[in-house]
Amino acid sequence: MGGIQSYLRDFVALLPPEDVVVFASTQDPMAAREFDKSVPYKVVRYSSKLMLPTPQVKKLMVDLIKSEGVSTVWFGAAAPLAVMAPAARAAGAIQIISTTHGHEVGWSMVPGARSVLRFIGQHSDVVTYISDYTLRRFQRAFGEHPKFVHLPSGVDVERFYPVDEKQKFELRDQLGWAEKDKVIVCTSRLVPRKGQDTLIKAFPEIVQRCSKARLVIVGEGRIEGKLRRLAARDQKASSRISFEGRVSEEKMGMMLRGADVFAMPCRTRGGGLDVEGLGIVFLEAQACGIPVIAGDSGGAPETVTPASGVVVNGRDSSGVAHVIVDLVQQPAALMSMGHAGRQHVVDHWTWEIMGARLKSLIL
């Protein structure tokens, strides 16, 4: 399940099931059947793997709005699905909500796509956004008509939680990490924007200054081979780097709780087309009570406070090394930043907060 699908699944789970009808594509028929049986709300499937605003999809949507008496239509991916907003309103919808995820920044930079965003804005009552950065980049493209509402993913603070020192050492034993290791974890897709290469380039300097440092890279992606080759260039450093691949949500939580620092020095690429919309992983790490090192791309800096994390230039490996070494060698700072991060998430980023925000928009 991709990021947008997960986002929508988690938000829909917060709504009264008797008031919800989901119209969705079918990526995997068997998985779709199992999912649909497991949820308490009604799911209507479009047979194709991809849902685009075609005449067939529009007709099915209109029929569903009429048959179910739908008053609010929520387009889970504004671009391009919300071009069907006029048809939804003509079918009886009173409120149109269109949700953005970050890729609309790229659309706003291309004249033809920008005009599509303007059309969506003219016919939507609410456009939601995941970060102030993305709003700044595309607000003018959507125009003045819609109300803009901040609606990022929430964090499950019962699944992502901190542990005490004894529990941390027990987790490390299960994960094969030494008690005295200084563990830096990065969990993300292995793609150029995320900055795992910067961490690997920084690591020889980190190990030179902190011999107990350990870098744990979690995730899969198209640059894994390149990253492994980069890590192998320095024998001493490479022995302290592990590639964990894809892990379960349970194990990812264990890794975050057992780590000293979370680092993902993301950077903007492609002249602004490839940018970090927000970065929920930064918030999940803070919920687990560990300091965060975030790259200065897009909305990533909005996830941390000066008390809970450090924002770095994702292209400056030496600067990243300096920040990491400075942090892991200060146990008191690790603890205070971890506490601050947990409180930051509990106060501002829980699903309870985000769910209430969504419910306030629905008529």
Each language-model region and where it sits:
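Acidic donor-binding loop of glycosyltransferase active sites
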Residues: 257-275, 290
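Carbohydrate-associated surface elements
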Residues: 133, 154
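Short His-centered aromatic/hydrophobic patch
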Residues: 75-81
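N-terminal strand-loop element at the rim of the active site
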Residues: 1, 6-53, 134, 139-141, ...
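Conserved acidic donor-binding segment of nucleotide-sugar-dependent glycosyltransferases
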Residues: 296, 305-317, 326-332
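Conserved donor-binding/catalytic core segment of Leloir-type glycosyltransferases
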Residues: 172, 178-194, 200-204
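A short, well-ordered alpha-helix in the C-terminal region of glycosyltransferases
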Residues: 319, 326, 333-347, 357
